Amino acid sequence: MTTAARPTFEPARGGRGKGEGDLSQLSKQYSSRDLPSHTKIKYRQTTQDAPEEVRNRDFRRELEERERAAAREKNRDRPTREHTTSSSVSKKPRLDQIPAANLDADDPLTDEEDEDEDFEEESDDDDTAALLAELEKIKKERAEEQARKEQEQKAEEERIRMENILSGNPLLNLTGPSQPQANFKVKRRWDDDVVFKNCAKGVDDQKKDKRFVNDTLRSEFHKKFMEKYIK
């Protein structure tokens, strides 16, 4: 990491350094990084494959010793595996493997152990087939139950939707036997009773009862005055 950005608390002053008596000479400063380093050559030690050691070594003999050691290590594990293999093989020999001279009249002609093993294998196969069949049956029942539940849910949703449609329409509610009779009244417009309505010509020509109108132009007095003095 560079140290160029560090502030200089002791600036260089020419002629005042060590061994500088002449002010006209330039100041001399040296960094510790400028000093010579690694001034001695490093040599290989006794255990670092020096040239003398390499010349005196017999690589062929070392290789042969390593191969013999590996062979001994491999043969050490072999008796254990051979013992395991021999124990697994040490079963009663089959009938076809026994020579005819060694057969006894009392010996059975069939191998009972083989028959027992075959029977056990067949029984295991039967049990496995039965379990698989039972599993398939359970899966099928669950699928049918799921389909039935989905169908019932769809039917219930459809029924609720139809009820909402029928109950939301007042005209359809009248047809139902249990729906109460509703009286429909036409609402009056918000501008039915306003004063300035139907101001077109000829609308007020019809005979109407005299009534007070809060409008000087449509009042009876104004109409009579206009008919008498203006027309």
Swiss-Prot record:
The modification N-acetylthreonine is found at T2. It is found in: Nucleus. The modification N6-acetyllysine is found at K18. Residues 104-128 have a biased composition (Acidic residues). InterPro entries: Cwf_Cwc_15. The modification Phosphothreonine is found at T47, T110. GO terms for cellular component: catalytic step 2 spliceosome; mitochondrion; nuclear speck; nucleus; Prp19 complex; spliceosomal complex; U2-type catalytic step 2 spliceosome. GO terms for molecular function: RNA binding. Keywords: Acetylation, Coiled coil, mRNA processing, mRNA splicing, Nucleus, Phosphoprotein, Spliceosome. Residues 24-34 have a biased composition (Polar residues). Residues 125-167 form a coiled coil. Residues 52-84 have a biased composition (Basic and acidic residues). Residues 1-132 are annotated as: Disordered. The modification Phosphoserine is found at S123. Identified in the spliceosome C complex. Component of the PRP19-CDC5L splicing complex composed of a core complex comprising a homotetramer of PRPF19, CDC5L, PLRG1 and BCAS2, and at least three less stably associated proteins CTNNBL1, CWC15 and HSPA8. Interacts directly with CTNNBL1 in the complex. Component of the minor spliceosome, which splices U12-type introns. Involved in pre-mRNA splicing as component of the spliceosome. Component of the PRP19-CDC5L complex that forms an integral part of the spliceosome and is required for activating pre-mRNA splicing. As a component of the minor spliceosome, involved in the splicing of U12-type introns in pre-mRNAs. This is Spliceosome-associated protein CWC15 homolog. It comes from Bos taurus (Bovine).
